[in-house]
Amino acid sequence: MTSHRTWLALPLLAALGSNSAARPPAGPWDLNGHQLLEAPLDGSLADDLGPQQPQELRVMVSSRTAAAYMLGIAAGSEGARWCRPAGQSGPPDVQALVADLVALPDTRLDERASDLVAQALAKRYPCKPAKPRRPSR
């Protein structure tokens, strides 16, 4: 029985282990930069609303979903890829991140949006290198 499960898991493991840069985005959680920037304009991240909903509502929901996506990347990478400036509270400035992404060359926007957002956060909010400790006497 165990070997049967192992054989069933092999295709899944192969798919998960493949090079993510070589495969196209698989769904709304795996966007490229173009898709992330276009989502607030075209309503593409509001598929769960259905086609009967007004386009204005789809655009509004898609815009909020794109912002939540960026804030999710920020929450998951804070302290490892970027650091909150001293005294700052609240989330990073989403509009500033969007501006950073828009400023990228068009070819960079073919890359995974999650990587682009994390890189924009790291550039805008870099972590300060740790100060070397003085030896105690």
Segments predicted by a language model, with ranges:
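Short coil/turn segments at secondary-structure boundaries
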Residues: P85-S89, L104-L109
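Sec-exported extracytoplasmic/periplasmic mature domains
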Residues: M70-E78, V102-D106, L121-P126
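Short helix/strand-capping connector loops at secondary-structure junctions
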Residues: V94-L104
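Short N-proximal segments of mature Sec-exported proteins
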Residues: P24-A96
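Bacterial N-terminal signal peptides that target proteins for export
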Residues: M1-L8
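C-terminal partner/receptor-binding element of secreted or periplasmic proteins
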Residues: T107-R137
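N-terminal signal peptide c-region/cleavage motif recognized by signal peptidases
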Residues: A15-S20
